[in-house]
């Protein structure tokens, strides 16, 4: 039997989707299918061809195609969903809910039809509610429908800590839990620089400022860009999750998971520490939290529930 490369479909060929497709191919994680709506088929094909023509220079052999035809995605191992409208300055995540929910339902039907055994990773905002929508619409088991936010939020936190300490980001570890919004919960107590607790290295008021900047990280970029939202770091975060799955690395990474009693929550998608491997989300890790951390996570979960109330 012939051995084939993994097949990864990226739904949505905007800045985030296209950047994700490019990084996936560059790392040779699989052949990539970049999908967008029929009105954007030619630009999508153009982006894919442009990426492919970089392969001799960058030295990768993965194939990339652009299309609006979901038949091209058939038998994908992983489907990454980035499609939807982008956040604009002054727009709350709640404003996005109903428009992007319709997009999720439409995309999910196609994914189920053509790739019924795939693992789905959702990025579209508001990501906690959109991941829940895809889970319900797909009928897939919970370990095969995952949301991405914690890797990105943790990356932002690690970036700001590294800048504060003038250290390599490689030596900074941390976890950001909860919903992908202003009530996310950076766990300072579980964050380290070269194995040393951050609380031993950074004054409390500076740590609090870093936590607050992390919470507002997406909005900071939205305001600086003036049009659109972040895409390099979100794409890189998606790729880290995909790599953990296709290589069965069993990485400990924060991800948006469906909770059934973990951390005291039921029937909600929320960012928690997980193990990602060949089966998708293989395990949820329950950390011991202080009363203050529990209260912050409950507040974050309540924010997610409030967004979910807008779901049709």
UniProtKB/Swiss-Prot annotation:
Family the UniProt entry places it in: Belongs to the LDH/MDH superfamily. MDH type 3 family.
Name of this chain's protein: Malate dehydrogenase
Sequence positions that bind NAD(+): 12-17, 36, 100, 123-125
GO molecular function, one term: L-lactate dehydrogenase activity
Catalytic activity: (S)-malate + NAD(+) = oxaloacetate + NADH + H(+)
Record InterPro entries: L-lactate/malate_DH, Lactate/malate_DH_C, Lactate/malate_DH_N, Lactate_DH/Glyco_Ohase_4_C, Malate_DH_type3, NAD(P)-bd_dom_sf
Positions where Phosphoserine occurs in the chain: 149
Biological-process GO terms, alphabetical: lactate metabolic process; tricarboxylic acid cycle
Name of the top EC class for this enzyme: oxidoreductase
Organism: Bacillus israeli
Gene: mdh
UniProt keyword terms in alphabetical order: NAD, Oxidoreductase, Phosphoprotein, Tricarboxylic acid cycle
SUPFAM superfamilies for the chain: LDH C-terminal domain-like, NAD(P)-binding Rossmann-fold domains
Catalytic site positions: 180
Binding-site residues, substrate: 87, 93, 125, 156
Keyword match Oxidoreductase: yes
EC annotation from Swiss-Prot or TrEMBL: 1.1.1.37
Quaternary structure, from the entry: Homotetramer.
Domain of life: Bacteria
Stated role: Catalyzes the reversible oxidation of malate to oxaloacetate.
């Amino acid at each position: 039997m012939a051995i084939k490369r993994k097949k990864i479909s990226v739904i949505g060929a905007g800045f985030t989707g296209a950047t994700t497709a490019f990084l996936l191919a560059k790392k040779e994680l699989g052949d990539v299918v970049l999908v967008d709506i029929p009105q954007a088929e030619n630009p999508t094909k153009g982006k894919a061809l442009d990426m492919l023509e970089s392969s001799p220079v960058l030295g990768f052999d993965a194939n990339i195609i652009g299309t609006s035809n979901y038949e091209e995605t058939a038998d994908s191992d992983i489907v990454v969903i980035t499609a939807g409208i982008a956040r604009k300055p002054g727009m709350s995540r709640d404003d996005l809910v109903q428009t992007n929910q319709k997009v999720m339902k439409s995309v999910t039907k196609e994914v189920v039809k053509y790739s019924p055994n795939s693992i789905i990773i959702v990025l579209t905002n508001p990501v906690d509610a959109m991941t829940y929508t895809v889970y319900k619409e797909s009928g897939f088991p919970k370990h095969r429908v995952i949301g991405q936010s914690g890797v990105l939020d943790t990356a932002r936190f690690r970036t700001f800590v590294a800048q504060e300490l003038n250290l390599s980001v490689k030596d900074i570890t941390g976890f950001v839990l909860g919903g992908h919004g202003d009530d996310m919960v950076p766990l300072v107590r579980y964050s380290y620089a070269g194995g040393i607790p951050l609380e031993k290295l950074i004054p409390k008021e500076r740590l609090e400022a870093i936590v607050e900047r992390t919470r507002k990280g997406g909005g900071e970029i939205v305001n600086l860009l003036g049009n659109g939202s972040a895409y390099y770091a979100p794409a890189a975060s998606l790729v880290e999750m995909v790599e953990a799955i296709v290589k069965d690395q069993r990485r400990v990474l924060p991800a948006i998971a469906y909770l059934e009693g973990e951390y005291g929550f039921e029937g909600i998608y929320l960012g928690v520490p997980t193990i990602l491997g060949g089966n998708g989300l293989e395990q949820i890790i329950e950390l011991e939290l202080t009363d203050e951390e529990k209260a912050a996570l409950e507040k974050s979960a309540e924010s997610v529930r409030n967004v979910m109330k807008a779901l049709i």
